[in-house]
Structures are given as structure tokens and as C-alpha cells.
Amino acid sequence: MSRKKMGLLVMAYGTPYKEEDIERYYTHIRRGRKPEPEMLQDLKDRYEAIGGISPLAQITEQQAHNLEQHLNEIQDEITFKAYIGLKHIEPFIEDAVAEMHKDGITEAVSIVLAPHFSTFSVQSYNKRAKEEAEKLGGLTITSVESWYDEPKFVTYWVDRVKETYASMPEDERENAMLIVSAHSLPEKIKEFGDPYPDQLHESAKLIAEGAGVSEYAVGWQSEGNTPDPWLGPDVQDLTRDLFEQKGYQAFVYVPVGFVADHLEVLYDNDYECKVVTDDIGASYYRPEMPNAKPEFIDALATVVLKKLGR
């Protein structure tokens, strides 16, 4: 039986490939407005603090490659071909769709490397992909909208949290707080009934219950530099408040809204949150990110096949 050929569009935020890319990358995020010199320097300093340009670009490539390979191994009806489409740097989402079209792909499935749906992120990625496909004609894209509740994905984090708690000294384990977080978005998304905040709360509940952790809280991180109010509480403020209320000896951070080691995790968690835990005299823990680990790739493959009714 011959296999059907299908495009696998893997979308992500994107990251600079080298230091010279930082300004144009930041300008794209700011919708064509160049950043002020001090804003640009601040971003460069953050990258410098994590040891240079974030590994995200390489990790995204590995995730897409491994997902293609795994999908082609676990079923025999479809041959998937992966294409990477990024929001803020090349290859842009439109570039990936054009590449699929050029390769004669007529059907594709898309997945965003962000587990929770929001109008601000996932919906805009899928919209860009579908608009480009319609413009070119002859290409239909089926889009995954969210996958935070995929049992295999939840299990990935449950296992990491259990390992982290098992590694703690007993006195810390009995006095630890789990903080589950995602990228903050402007508060106005709530006016449109955006499910994003509820999905993060559901994620936190699934992970905490699965790991047998009763002391947990939900926080937001990495908010943008705009005058609008953003979803809170911020993880750093939350850490201080929880410490003042209960005097926790250890904080465990699970940035479940992210799937890879990049600036938001390596700087906003591993540096900024650790500054807070050091200041209050508590221990800092942050389990390993999914990156391209086999159990995470298997979770994504399961999500894709379920979306296609297989």
C-alpha cells in the first residue's frame, strides 16, 4: 500500500541565529519599530548572561526533524515531511507554506510548539499559515489548536516534578512550593473569552495532582514591555508573596507554557527567579525542559495523529 504524502508544519516563535540578527528580530516583534538603543542593549545583555544566543533555533530544528521521523516510524499510511515556520524570523510561516506548495504538497497538518491556545499566539500562527495557503491555492491545512491536556505531555511533566521532589532533602520537600507558569499576555485577551488563562490553570492542576503535590500556584512570566496591563501575578512577585505568607524553603518552577531551553527559561527563570530565591534564602529548582526528548516527541506525534483521526 502506498503512503499518502503530507506536510507537517511545525511553528514556533523563532529566535536570533547570531548576534547580528538581534536588532532585526526585535524590530519584527515590535511590528517594524526599531528598538531604542538601551532596549536593544538590554536584550543583548540577557543573551550574554545565558552564554550567548539562545539554543532555541537548533532545538526547534531538532524537534521538527525528530517529530517527522517518529511519525513516519509509528504508522504506515502517511509519509510526513516537516517544514519549520517561525513567527519573527526566517523561515517565516509564509515561507514554510510556500515551500510546501512548491514541493507539491496538497494536504498538511500544523502544530505550534506552545501547548495552550490563545488568540494572541496560536490562533495568529494558524491564521497566517491558512491565509498563505489560500493565497497560493491547492493546499489544505488542518491545524492543532492546543495540546496541553495530552496525557503523554502531562506525564512528561509529572515525571520531572516527581524526580525533582525526590532529589530534595526531606526538610525542603516537606516545605516546597510548585509554581507552574506560562508566558504572560495582555490582560485584554480575557475580554474576548480567550481560554489561555484557564488552560494554564488546568495544566497546573493536572501536573500537581499527577505528581501528588498539594502546594502549588499558577504564575505568569516574561511579560512584554508595553503600557497595557498583562496577566499576573508575575512569578517573581508570586515567589516573594508565597515566601512571606508561608516561609517555603524551596520553590520548583515548571514553565509549562514553553517547550525548550531559551531566553525566557534560561534567563527569566534560571536567573531572575533564582535572584529572588537567593534573596529570600530558599532553594531554586527547575526540572528539565522537554526539548527533543523522545517522550515529548512521542506526545507531539500522538497529538498530530489524533487530530488526523488516526
Swiss-Prot record:
N-methylmesoporphyrin binds at residues 13, 31-33, 183, 188. Changing residue 13 to M: Changes the metal specificity of the enzyme. Can insert Co(2+) into protoporphyrin IX at a higher rate than the wild-type enzyme, but loses the ability to insert Cu(2+) and Zn(2+). Fe-coproporphyrin III binds at residues 13, 30, 46-47, 54, 125. InterPro entries: Ferrochelatase, Ferrochelatase_AS, Ferrochelatase_C, Ferrochelatase_N. Changing residue 88 to A: Retains 5% of activity. Its main location: cytoplasm. Changing residue 87 to A: Retains 92% of activity. It is found in: Cytoplasm. GO terms for cellular component: cytoplasm. Changing residue 272 to S: Abolishes the effect of Mg(2+). Coiled coil: none annotated. It holds the Pfam family Ferrochelatase. The keyword Iron applies. Pathway: Porphyrin-containing compound metabolism; protoheme biosynthesis. Changing residue 264 to V: Retains less than 1% of activity. Disruption phenotype: Deletion mutant requires hemin for growth. Mg(2+) binds at residues 20, 46, 268, 272. Disulfide bonds: none annotated. Monomer. Interacts with frataxin/Fra. Belongs to the ferrochelatase family. Involved in coproporphyrin-dependent heme b biosynthesis. Catalyzes the insertion of ferrous iron into coproporphyrin III to form Fe-coproporphyrin III. It can also insert iron into protoporphyrin IX. Has weaker activity with 2,4 disulfonate, deuteroporphyrin and 2,4 hydroxyethyl. In vitro, can also use Zn(2+) or Cu(2+). This is Coproporphyrin III ferrochelatase. It comes from Bacillus subtilis (strain 168). The gene is cpfC.
